[in-house]
């Protein structure tokens, strides 16, 4: 909303600062972080009282988890979403359609995750509601978002899939594009969901990916930088940098409480929402393939589950000691902090590789 103050800059010049995306991105980051840090203890106390036993812990997982994680409340994504939404509404341009599409996906996926968490906590079971029904709901939200994005995208880029590295390489997917875009968004949401299994494991790679895509959105949404880098210019997507800034700020605030030993878990409420957000930004900026690089850690986690399930059904044997793959390394003897920090390092390397594609033309 503060962006609207820039309309008064002709009367009071200092208000012109609210036009700058970089200034508002910093403001969103600071606001979201302060919000989560300030209200975090109250939210954690409330969730602990409401949930009692907290998130159910897998009996077949590392035995240390039964001792160190039992009783920890979940639904910490509420903290992240609350801080991010407040900051976005305060600092982002309310006239920007990409902001509203991204918010819709984020809150829609967050609501699905919240209900799933609610069922798990109340039933003290790892099974939420039907996986197929959950995927169907996510697909409907994602499809609606992709159709809206396509409507507002430049005519030359509608229904086009852009390839990194290759200059002007576009593939017209036609009416199949919304399906592809929905696959990206739903896949991103569930991949981040699979990654969220250890203290701090998911939130830092999410912040790294958000920082990367915030930078990409800023460059793609600026005609000068897009022309210089020879990437597709998508007008108005620069505003998504403010959204990414808000998520990073909220993520930093959440990490304060999620650092080991975690006082709260993100839960499906946060992981589905944040993954959906990343997917929708990738679709809006026409960098869907780059998301697979930047978010390669999330892809690895999801693929480990798919491979494990497929292998067991086809051969009766498991490829990994346990899936997702972060538990495989725990079963091999890695300590939880080792797994988490090494996966963070991988996330940084993949983010740098994703950014490198902007320059390779």
Curated annotation (Swiss-Prot):
CDD domains: GT_MraY
Membrane spanning stretches: 27-47, 72-92, 99-119, 135-155, 169-189, 200-220, 240-260, 264-284, 289-309, 338-358
Broadest EC class assigned to this enzyme: transferase
Stretch forming the signal peptide: none
Annotated PROSITE patterns: MRAY_1, MRAY_2
PANTHER family to which the protein is assigned, alphabetical: PHOSPHO-N-ACETYLMURAMOYL-PENTAPEPTIDE-TRANSFERASE, PHOSPHO-N-ACETYLMURAMOYL-PENTAPEPTIDE-TRANSFERASE HOMOLOG
InterPro entries with a match to the protein in the record: Glycosyl_transferase_4, PNAcMuramoyl-5peptid_Trfase, PNAcMuramoyl-5peptid_Trfase_CS
Catalyzed reaction equations: UDP-N-acetyl-alpha-D-muramoyl-L-alanyl-gamma-D-glutamyl-meso-2,6-diaminopimeloyl-D-alanyl-D-alanine + di-trans,octa-cis-undecaprenyl phosphate = di-trans,octa-cis-undecaprenyl diphospho-N-acetyl-alpha-D-muramoyl-L-alanyl-D-glutamyl-meso-2,6-diaminopimeloyl-D-alanyl-D-alanine + UMP
Keyword Protein biosynthesis: no
Protein name in UniProt: Phospho-N-acetylmuramoyl-pentapeptide-transferase
Cofactor(s) listed in the protein's UniProt record: Mg(2+)
The family this protein is said to belong to: Belongs to the glycosyltransferase 4 family. MraY subfamily.
Gene Ontology molecular function, alphabetical: metal ion binding; phospho-N-acetylmuramoyl-pentapeptide-transferase activity; UDP-N-acetylmuramoyl-L-alanyl-D-glutamyl-meso-2,6-diaminopimelyl-D-alanyl-D-alanine:undecaprenyl-phosphate transferase activity
Topology of this chain in the membrane: Multi-pass membrane protein
Gene Ontology cellular component terms for the protein in this record: plasma membrane
Keywords of this entry: Cell cycle, Cell division, Cell inner membrane, Cell membrane, Cell shape, Cell wall biogenesis/degradation, Magnesium, Membrane, Metal-binding, Peptidoglycan synthesis, Transferase, Transmembrane, Transmembrane helix
Location in the cell: Cell inner membrane
Function: Catalyzes the initial step of the lipid cycle reactions in the biosynthesis of the cell wall peptidoglycan: transfers peptidoglycan precursor phospho-MurNAc-pentapeptide from UDP-MurNAc-pentapeptide onto the lipid carrier undecaprenyl phosphate, yielding undecaprenyl-pyrophosphoryl-MurNAc-pentapeptide, known as lipid I.
Pathway linked to the protein: Cell wall biogenesis; peptidoglycan biosynthesis
This enzyme's EC code(s): 2.7.8.13
NCBIfam families documented for this protein: mraY
Single Gene Ontology BP annotation: cell division
Organism from which the protein derives: Methylobacterium radiotolerans (strain ATCC 27329 / DSM 1819 / JCM 2831 / NBRC 15690 / NCIMB 10815 / 0-1)
